[in-house]
């Protein structure tokens, strides 16, 4: 039986500082994702890759999330490094991400060192760029998985919502920085110091961001150390790892399973929104609001991207504000056992205010319903302003979607680990009310955490295994990535039925005047509507989670 020894702690004199340091890696993760999602498609097209093949490349995202995060979670859960279970993998993966970003940005220059002829270098350049994208996707999923698990491992049950909220805040900051960096002419400001193009300079900045943000979190956090008994098997084969993942999926605790199913149905809706919102906004503009001269644009695709990005900046501002304000207005899942004592003068007011706060489940349900209401109106959008309004309405639901599942799963994992009532004692790190971490010391028999091997026990033991946050968050990510494959399948059918050819808004030759059909429903809007209906199912599944174990939700849904 393995044991966790030592003390988990976070540097910093105040709760705010500690939470920022704990979640700081999220800024680099989000910034890197944003640069990849925004700039890699035109970059691949510029290298000579066809659009159909480019779309296949982006299977890397959900594929890496489906495969890498659960495996990384299992490996990290059993890591016996003296530096802890999560941080060594975070650092190694961040280095791989940074190196791959540099390869991606300077692909032409690297290939030119080996292949001199321009035409002969095209295929090797494309191949190297595609490999770099896959490596970035796979490695950054490891950083993401370990950073989430680090929050769960380090914070007690009462602080799980706070930790998830701060991760959402750092994520929104990463998005804001990404939008700002992408909108600035870096060549004019920095010259050619970091590269000869905007994309090259952004990849260098992203590499610095992922390394720097990961280093800050790893420096600030001290983990418990996993100690294996003498003679115990130190590592598992890939087959054993996959068996453990499958076994854990089959024997998930009921409430964890309910959270996963709610996530599954909601992400069918979020996939269409996240991947197609910019294009939908641009197409709506060209279909209903663009003046005749705009329809004749030689760069309709570029114009569409800029128009969509301008609206998404407003959306990102709403997300940014919501990430800071909403957690203050929502009651923690375990707030009853962790209350700060306000001054007597305002104690009555604070008590009444806390009684009026909605809980996290209610907030998540409201987020589902608001998103569903907004996107169900997408097929009826007949103006760019109305489409922008609908997208902006999804800002707060997105904030909740990034925060609620992680917080709720963190609470459940902590309860499985004995972090709730009857669990280990806590020690305060400072005089400020806030973060209290488990007091787990070497030789303290009442505080040492023992880990059972999930492959060596009964079903009940598998369901209640402690300190397996890595594999649980990896499984949650499976329920996040599978809907992306479903969304791709749905979009393929809708596009083939409604817009089997080229998008009429992208014809670039005045499509409305040439008789190209634009009066029918927009195919992307139909995908958004289907996603809205799926999110209604997610709201129902989340409501079932409130009723108890949540078994009813997946008895009829999966």
Language-model segment annotations:
Residues 78-99, 110-113, 328-368, 420-421, ...:
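Cytoplasmic membrane-interface "Motif A"-like loop-to-helix N-cap segments
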Residues 73-78, 105, 111, 174-197, ...:
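Transmembrane alpha-helix termini and helix-breaking/packing motifs in multi-pass membrane transporters
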Residues 2-64, 258-294:
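Helix-loop boundary and gating motifs at the non-cytosolic
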């Amino acid at each position: 039986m393995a044991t966790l020894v030592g003390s988990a702690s976070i540097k910093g004199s105040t709760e705010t500082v500690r939470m920022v340091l704990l979640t700081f890696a999220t800024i680099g993760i989000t910034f890197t994702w944003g640069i990849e999602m925004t700039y890699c498609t035109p970059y691949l097209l510029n290298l000579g890759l066809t659009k159909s093949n480019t779309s296949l490349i982006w299977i890397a995202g959900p594929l890496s999330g489906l495969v890498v995060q659960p495996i990384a979670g299992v490996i990290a859960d059993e890591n016996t490094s003296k530096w802890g279970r999560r941080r060594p993998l975070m650092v190694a993966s961040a280095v791989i991400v940074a190196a791959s970003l540099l390869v991606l940005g300077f692909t032409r220059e690297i290939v030119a060192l080996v292949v001199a002829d321009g035409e002969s270098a095209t295929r090797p350049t494309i191949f190297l760029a595609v490999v770099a994208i896959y490596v970035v996707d796979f490695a950054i999923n490891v950083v993401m998985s370990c950073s989430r698990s680090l929050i769960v491992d380090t914070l007690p049950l009462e602080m799980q919502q706070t930790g998830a909220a701060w991760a959402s805040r750092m994520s929104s900051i990463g998005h804001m920085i990404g939008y700002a960096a992408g909108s600035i002419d870096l060549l004019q400001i920095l010259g050619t110091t970091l590269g000869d193009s905007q994309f090259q300079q952004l990849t260098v900045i992203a590499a610095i961001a992922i390394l720097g943000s990961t280093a800050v979190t790893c420096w600030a956090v001290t983990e418990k150390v996993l100690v294996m008994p003498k003679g115990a098997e130190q590592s598992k084969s890939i087959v054993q790892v996959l068996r453990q993942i499958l076994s854990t999926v089959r024997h998930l605790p009921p409430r964890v399973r309910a959270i996963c199913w709610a996530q599954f149905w909601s992400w069918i809706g979020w996939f269409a929104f996240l991947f197609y919102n910019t294009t939908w906004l641009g197409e709506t503009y060209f279909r209903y609001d663009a003046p005749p001269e705009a329809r004749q644009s030689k760069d309709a695709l570029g114009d569409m991207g800029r128009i969509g990005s301008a609206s998404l900046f407003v959306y990102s501002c709403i997300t940014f504000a919501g990430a800071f304000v909403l957690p203050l207005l929502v009651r923690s899942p375990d707030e009853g056992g962790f209350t700060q004592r306000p001054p007597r003068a305002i104690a009555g007011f604070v008590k009444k205010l806390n009684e009026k706060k909605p809980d996290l489940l209610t907030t998540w349900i409201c987020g589902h319903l608001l998103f569903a209401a907004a996107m169900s109106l997408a097929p009826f959008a007949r103006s760019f302003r109305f489409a922008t309004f609908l997208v902006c309405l999804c800002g707060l639901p997105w904030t909740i979607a990034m925060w609620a599942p992680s917080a709720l799963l963190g609470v459940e994992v902590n309860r499985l680990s004995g972090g709730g009532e009857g669990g280990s004692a806590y020690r305060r790190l400072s005089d400020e009310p806030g973060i209290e971490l488990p007091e787990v010391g070497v030789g303290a028999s009442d505080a040492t955490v023992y880990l059972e091997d999930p492959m060596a026990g009964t079903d009940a033991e598998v369901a209640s295994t402690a300190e397996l946050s890595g594999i649980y968050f990896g499984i949650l990510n499976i329920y996040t990535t599978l809907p992306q494959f479903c969304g791709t399948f749905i979009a393929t059918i809708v596009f083939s039925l409604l817009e089997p050819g080229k998008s009429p808004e992208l014809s670039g030759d005045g499509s409305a005047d040439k008789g190209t059909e634009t009066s029918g429903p927009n195919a992307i809007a139909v995908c958004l509507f289907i996603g809205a209906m799926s999110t209604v199912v997610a709201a129902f599944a989340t409501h079932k989670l409130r009723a108890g174990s949540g078994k009813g939700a997946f008895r009829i849904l999966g």
